[in-house]
Amino acid sequence: MTHDLAASGLRFGIEEEFFLLDASDLDIVRSAPAGFVAACRDTLGEHFAEEMFECQVEVASPVFSTLAEAARFHGQARQRLAHLAMDFGLRSLCVGTHPFADWRRARSNPAAHFARLFEDQGRVARRSLVCGLHVHVEIPPSHDRMAVLQRVLPWLPLLLALSASSPFRGGRRSGLASYRRALCGEWPRMNIPPALPDEDAYRRHLALLREAGCIREDGQVWWMIRPSSHVPTLELRICDACPRLADALSLAGLFRALVGEALGAGPRTLPVARDACLEENYWQALRYGCAGRYLVGGRAVGAGDWLEMAWRQCRPQARQGNEWAYEHARGLLGETSASRQLRRYQTLRAAGQERHVALRRLVEELLEENLQPALAGPAGKRAHEGGRSFRPAAGAPMSIRGQE
């Protein structure tokens, strides 16, 4: 593979999850009104999907070649979903956790796929009222996806820190920048992937899990990064859903650059200390976000230094087309969604607002952020159309969305 293909030529896709709220009190709804799902399917087509709770939906993109394309599609999709929701007395909210919703009010989706999840995972699934951001980056067939995964993996806590948007749970401060990822840790096969060296080892591992009855299908391996089971991509799953679309686009661009660098790099041995440092860095990101101290190269560094190290490691070809993503991420170092939510809540409480009033105002501000226009790339182009579909080896078109 040439460095050009390993860089700006990498196609990608983005999946965003949303809560559905009652427009009157801004709490989650138990069920969407009759006709809402059908209206969403009519408007968003194959890019719309229901989720494991009836108060959640997902928008899965077509395939993009540039961040400007992604800005166009997702900017329009957020607007369309918001308008449809308002037509049905709802609001759509993209954030890691709803600041004051009670997970016990959420009604599980009765569809067979989701019913099996709740049967298998019990209360762990019931408690998982969270929204995430997933990014797919296409891996050329000449490269082994597990080998690329292992090269990218050590950087993932940095992406979590930048995306953190779930500091509240059930109306209380959780003490974590990403409470969503703490909940993910209750699930099997949802945290750090094992050190499998290549896709052959990965397939053998999946076969063992199926034979043992641990999983019903390959898609039930939910690691924070995984080879997709239905399209030729690596899927980033660690990030919280981003209230601001620009943040989501920045994370997609950074991940794409890191994958491009991994594709262009020669084979190397992973450090023995990887697991220990990765686990600690993951905790630092989950707990402190961009205020964490990260173990990199045998020393502790801040998120800003780590981001600069990540960008500096990427070859010019891997950076190409993703420069805006890095510049935007530098701005997130000063205030992520999680730290902004906490700051605003503290300001409102200090001004004498009751807790429930401050939390409602917080949701109102998050809803406003959801519809802020995103500027992707130096030209700041906005979009109204998407790209193509990934294709498997046989050549049949595929959607990036698959079973969770």
From Swiss-Prot:
| Example of a GO biological process term | modified amino acid biosynthetic process
Read off the Gene3D superfamilies from this record.
3.30.590.20
Kindly indicate whether the keyword Cell inner membrane belongs to this entry.
no
Keyword ATP-binding (UniProt): yes
Q: Which InterPro entries match?
A: GCL_type2/YbdK_subfam (IPR050141), GCS2 (IPR006336), Gln_synth/guanido_kin_cat_dom (IPR014746), YbdK (IPR011793)
EC number(s) recorded for this UniProt protein: 6.3.2.2
Tell me which family the UniProt entry assigns to this protein. Belongs to the glutamate--cysteine ligase type 2 family. YbdK subfamily.
Q: What is this protein called?
A: Putative glutamate--cysteine ligase 2
Organism, as annotated: Pseudomonas aeruginosa (strain UCBPP-PA14)
